A protein has these predicted regions:
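Compact, glycine-rich, soluble single-domain proteins
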Residues: 45, 49-52, 56-98, 102
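Beta-strand/loop substructures that line and gate deep hydrophobic ligand-binding cavities in soluble
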Residues: 99-126
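Terminal, regulation- and interaction-focused segments at domain boundaries
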Residues: 19-48, 145-149
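N-terminal secretory signal peptides that target proteins for export/translocation
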Residues: 1-2
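Bacterial N-terminal signal peptides
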Residues: 5-16
Length: 151
């Protein structure tokens, strides 16, 4: 009995992990991680949004004598979009401001990854067809496309 419950639990975790991964949108970048995040930051600021934080995970790892391939996260947002989401479901603050991760994989390819706003809308009981979700989705696509453009 316990054995069946254990395997059912593992299956549930695997399914949840797969669903969470399916809700991530990923693009590749021809630029380094640092340049990709620089370009993203410039695009965010040009769009009139606010950059709240830039986290260099590899630098953090180096501070504790560990090595991590280049990995940086940019946290940004616009209260005109985030506030209505939080008014509909205050727990949306766990996923806001928006975050985009750029990292270099073992083969040297730079990836840009972010969560699809529709997935966190569902997680926080927000209406999936809300205008702010559509606007966040469009903004993330536009901003990450600018950051990963070959130009």
């Amino acid at each position: 009995m316990i054995r069946h419950a254990f395997f059912a639990g593992l299956l549930g975790l695997a399914t949840a992990s797969s669903a969470w991964a399916a809700d991530m949108i990923e693009k590749t970048s021809p630029h380094s991680v640092a340049e990709t995040i620089d370009r993203l930051e410039a695009a965010v600021e040009a769009a009139g949004a606010t950059v709240f934080a830039r986290v260099d995970h590899a630098a953090g790892a180096a501070n504790v004598d560990m090595e991590l391939r280049p990995t940086q996260m940019l946290m940004f947002g616009n209260p005109k979009l985030g506030t209505p989401a939080m008014l509909d479901g205050q727990t949306a603050g766990l996923d806001l401001p928006l975050r985009v991760l750029a990292y270099e994989n073992g083969e040297g390819t730079v990836h840009v990854t972010y969560h699809d706003p529709a997935s966190f809308a569902a997680a926080h009981g927000l209406p999936g067809d809300a205008k702010y979700i559509q606007m966040m989705t469009g903004a993330l696509d536009k901003l990450t496309t600018a950051a990963t453009a070959a130009e």
